[in-house]
């Protein structure tokens, strides 16, 4: 019995259907990326009215700027903490729901709520909790003899923005991990238990390999989130301070491009950030994906 694949009556209809998405990609990604590449090799005035070709001078100046190199290091630390802690905590919570509280819709709903909160609002929420004078958490820490002031302590400021960023992303990770865990046949877990495998061994030798495709997908998503989507959290919580301790690459681009009106430097930083993200993505797909089991 032969089966025929349904097709379009008009040969140009498929292209017409994808045209809006192609237009959006061209206008909001390709065009800005091209502009950034062009501006990165130009010396622009603050208003962008005149320019002079300077080649790679903007990039050379970047890597001789100690503040830029510091923001580079801060970005790597911040993104690693946000992605790593977020994935581990989300997987733990999803495992608790799947194995302990399975079917608890109220608990699942409460876990999803943080995703509906805007990043800036999430930052403000944690600022209130950690306010040096009025915060509930700081009051508790003071009773233990610990002085908290993230406006003066760089380590505390980094802890605050990481905490707010992780809390904001946990719901997204939780949904994918829970769906992956609940898709595993119970018969496999029960068979492993009958063979004498304990809960920890079952999780690491059976469950974790089966959800590795979802884990790999979330690793890529969380790194991109940490690089780009945490800007509102940092801006609302610390403003990049104290002493640029929480200034990531994306926030430094904003500060120099929009606040300092140094368009050439911000464009060069945008190109470096784009190349960094592309490089990390290639590394993940070349090396990390090899350990992913899709069957």
From Swiss-Prot:
InterPro entries: MetI-like, MetI-like_sf, UgpAE/MalFG_permease. Residues 33-80, 131-157, 229-262 are periplasmic. Residues 72-284 form the ABC transmembrane type-1 domain. Keywords: Cell inner membrane, Cell membrane, Membrane, Transmembrane, Transmembrane helix, Transport. It is a multi-pass membrane protein. PROSITE patterns: ABC_TM1 (PS50928). The chain crosses the membrane at residues 12-32, 81-101, 110-130, 158-178, 208-228, 263-283. GO terms for biological process: transmembrane transport. Pfam families: BPD_transp_1 (PF00528). It is found in: Cell inner membrane. Belongs to the binding-protein-dependent transport system permease family. UgpAE subfamily. Part of the ABC transporter complex UgpBAEC involved in sn-glycerol-3-phosphate (G3P) import. Probably responsible for the translocation of the substrate across the membrane. This is sn-glycerol-3-phosphate transport system permease protein UgpA. It comes from Yersinia enterocolitica serotype O:8 / biotype 1B (strain NCTC 13174 / 8081). The lineage of its organism: Bacteria, Pseudomonadati, Pseudomonadota, Gammaproteobacteria, Enterobacterales.
